[in-house]
Each structure stands twice: as C-alpha cells, then as structure tokens.
Amino acid sequence: MNIDVATLLSQNDILLLFVVLALGLFIAKLRIGSFQLGSSIGVLITALFMGSLGYTFTADSLNIGFMLFIFCVGIEAGPNFFGIFLRDGKHYLLLVLVVLVSAVSLSFLTGHYFGLDYGLSTGMMAGALTATPVLVGAKDALNSGLAALPEGVDFSKVIDNLSVGYAFSYLIGLTSLILLARLLPKLQKQNLQDSAMQIAQERGIGSAGQRKVYLPIIRAYRVGQELIDWTDGKNLRELGIHRQTGCHIERIRRNGILANPDGDYILQQGDEIALVGYPDSHARLDSSFRNGKEVFDRNLLDLRIAEEEIVVKSDNIAGKRLSELNLSEYGCFLNRVVRAQIEMPIEHDIVLAKGDILQVSGEKSKVHYLADKIGFISIHSQVSDLLAFCSFFILGIMFGMITMSFGQVTFGLGNAVGLLISGITLGFLRANHPTFGYVPQGALNMTKNLGLLVFMVGIGLSAGGNINEYFSEDGLKVLAAAFIVSVIPVILAYLVGAYILNMNRALLIGAIIGARTCGPAMDVVNEHARSTIPALGYAGTYAIANILMTVAGTIMILLA
C-alpha cells in the first residue's frame, strides 16, 4: 500500500490542521538554554513553512479559533477586570496605557517611515508586544468591515501580512523584553533580587523556599503542671496559643468528656488537648507542652482536616488586606493566594479582590465556616456549565453584530469586542455566583489555547505562500520597526513607574511584563529575582492589558 503523504495532506483539511499543530507544538518545546519559542510562535512558524510548500485551506473556516480564544480571555479577566479601576489599580492602569499608547503611536510612525502596509504594521506591533490579542482585534476589525480599506488595497494580502509581521517581530519582542527587565534596574544600580527581598522584608513575605506547603497535622497532649504554670490562669483567648505556637487547640477532653473549646476555656491539669498545626509548628512547641505525656486516642484525634480553594466573593472582604482576615481566629491556615492564575506571594498587605483564590487548610467545619464568610468553596467538579458558556458566546456574537451609523459612516463592535464583553460578564458573574457558568480552569485553558493555535494555523497557512517575497522586500524594515516598538514603550513605562509612581523595581518590572501580557518573560524574571514578588505587579496589569490589547489592534488597523 502506497500512501502519498503530500496528497493526503492537501486533500484532508482536518489532518493538515492537526499535523501543523503537532509539529508546531514539538518545535515549541525545543529549548536553547533557558530560551523557548512558546506554543503560539512555534505553530505559526510551522504553518508559515507548510504554507510556503503550497498547503492551504480557507482561513475563514478557522474563525472559530480566535472567537473561542478571545471569549476565554474575557472569562479569565472578568473577576478582576472591574476592580482594576479601584484602589491602587489606577497605577497599573496608567502603566498599561503608557505601553499601549506609545506602542500604537510608534507603530503608526515607523510603519509610515518604512513604508509598511496596514497588515505588516499591525502584525509587527502584535509581535513586538508579544500580544496575540492585538492580532485578533485587527483581524476581526477587517473581517467585520469596521476597518474599511482604501481602493486598490488587496484585502487578502493585508490579512496575510498580519501573520507575517507577527512572526518576524515576535522573537525581537520577547528577547528585548527579557533583556530590558534585567538591564534597566542595573542602569540605576539596583538589583532585582535585592528589590524583591526589600518588599519581602517590608511586608513579611516568606521566600518560595520558606513557604513549603504541608497539610496541618493533629497531635494530642496531656496537660501537666509545667503547662499550667505557663498559662498562669489565663483563658485561651488571653493566651493567644496560635500567635505563640502556630497551633490551634481544636478539642479538649476533660473528665472523659470531649468538647470544642471557645476562647473562655482555662486549661486544667489532666486535660487532654488536640493541637492542629503544621509539622514544623509542632516541632517548635514549648517544652511545657511536650513534657506532658503525648496522648494517642482515636476519639480525641478524630478531626477531619480539609484543604479547600476558597474564592473571594464577599463585598465586605474585597478591598481588605489579607491581614484583616485574621485567619487564626477561624483556626485556619493559608497555603496559597492565586490571582489571574498567578501564584502571589503571601503578604499581609496584599489587597484582596473578588475572584482571588485562597487555598486554606484546617479542621473541615472551620474551613467551611470561613468559606461562608468570605466567599465560596471552588467547585471541584470536572463538568462545565456548557449552557451558560454557549449562551454567552451567542450573546457576544450578537453584540458584535450591532452597528451604528453617523452620516455615511457605519461601524460596529465586531466579534472580538462583542465576545470580550460577554466573556468578561460571564467571568464576573461566575466570581459572584458559584453555581453559575462554572468551567474548570483546565478546560478553560485548553479551549483558549486550542482556539489560539487553530487561529495561528489559519493565518500562517494563508500567508506562507508568499513568505519569501515578504521577507526579501520588507523583512529588515519589520525587524527594525519591531525593535523600536518593543523597546521604547518598556523604557517609558519604566521611567513613569520609577520616577512618577515611585514603584519598587521588582513590582515595576512585573507590572510592565503584565502590560505586555508576556508569560514566558515572567517566568524568566521570577527566576532572575529568585522570588515571586514580581508576580504581584504582573497580576495587577495582566487582566486589563489583555482587554486593551484587543482594542489597540482594532485602533491600529483603523489608523494604518
């Protein structure tokens, strides 16, 4: 049996799609030192190469890819989107605007100076900012008719040039951002690691190595005379056992009767107490605890330790600092804080926002009581609410179809903005109503990433046929423009953050990377700083930047 692979690929669009995806993802996993291409650029390069060999199919059939991607971006941003305009989020919003306004202005100017067309200028900006939403917003503006091209301009060539400009400039954008993140603090004779350590010391944040997470364990002790002398007749509230030991007294047996103590309890000799705490807290217990006989009793030790992810929902909690939660009063232990899928350093001054996820452990009833006070326990079901997902997707498309006329000019939102609005709404409602619109994070990530990669395959195959011609004519111009657009906005944002906002350099670098929505650079900077402190800044700008990048793509294609 003779199988002609070339013919098979040219005749089977679905097979071609997944072959390009598989090859691109394989290339994306290749690592040179600490440098990795990333899945989107790996798939795009593969698609351009396959397109140059003559493989193609109708890119319009792959519009579902970018529609799913932008809808999922909206869902992820929803819980934190509105909060970004409140509190200290205004600083982060300013940094995002500095990056975007300067990038759009420079892209417009360099595009005209180098004679780049609509597609190349906008694609170059998307790559220089390492921001796929720019590409998505521009393509949708063209497809929806929002951006009307002048007579004589080839629509298909503009679409092709979007992907070519993006592919040429992406590596410039990624490498320059990583280099600037390391170089700019050094020019001020500041060390990123020292800046991160300064914040950690000021705010009482442990390093990643110091915050190894364990489940609390239960041990029981019989109260002896030495412990009675130590308590000096004080009740549990006055003693503050947790403040001094890191453990909570969850249960007491007195005269054979088990009880859950309140703050008014006074320990008596012969009491048997069950302590809940991390292993290292038990190891550090005062000798007055350990000198009493340790008790191994099934009923006394029969406490159900639970670890749950609690989503912040309460209006009374959102906007408060972590220290104001007083978790010790609930007998609970905080293991992690996650915002916008980024693990945040556990710092007492961090301001909580709706949608934040607190990973909390402790006795089960107390964890659930805490969850009722501040929000709800994240659903662990793997079943998605597809009805809500599809309904809001439909609403997004309908929003995009709405048009308005001013005289002879007619324009509409387009699918990208419409789906962003509906996605943000679904994400916001999900953060406030736990049983509504639930989509497991893994499913959301897969849908978003697959949608993005399918979109990349479509534009890559479409543009690949003329890739050599584009590179020989405009390749060096695109690279030069990309360098300018990548570097100058970062420098401007750094100067604003350092000298106007007076931000800590570790937080500032993280915020700039978030404004560029560049996850790979964030990983490198965290490694360089030997801390997750920059993630605080990244989470502050990432959500709003993802949304405004899409709008910037639309604006750029309108200006070009």
UniProtKB/Swiss-Prot annotation:
Keyword Acetylation: no
Annotated keywords: Cell membrane, Membrane, Repeat, Transmembrane, Transmembrane helix, Transport
Its membrane topology: Multi-pass membrane protein
GO molecular function, a single term: monoatomic cation transmembrane transporter activity
Main location: membrane
Any single Gene Ontology cellular-component annotation: plasma membrane
Domain RCK C-terminal: 203-292, 293-376
Keyword Phosphoprotein: no
Cystine connections: none
GO biological process, one term: potassium ion transport
SUPFAM superfamilies: TrkA C-terminal domain-like
Subcellular location: Cell membrane
Record-annotated membrane-spanning stretches: 8-28, 37-57, 66-86, 94-114, 161-181, 386-406, 409-429, 451-471, 478-498, 539-559
PANTHER family: K(+)_H(+) ANTIPORTER SUBUNIT KHTT (PTHR30445), TRANSPORT PROTEIN YBJL-RELATED (PTHR30445:SF10)
Recorded family membership: Belongs to the AAE transporter (TC 2.A.81) family. YbjL subfamily.
HAMAP family in alphabetical order: YbjL
This protein's name: Putative transport protein VF_0889
UniProt source species: Aliivibrio fischeri (strain ATCC 700601 / ES114)
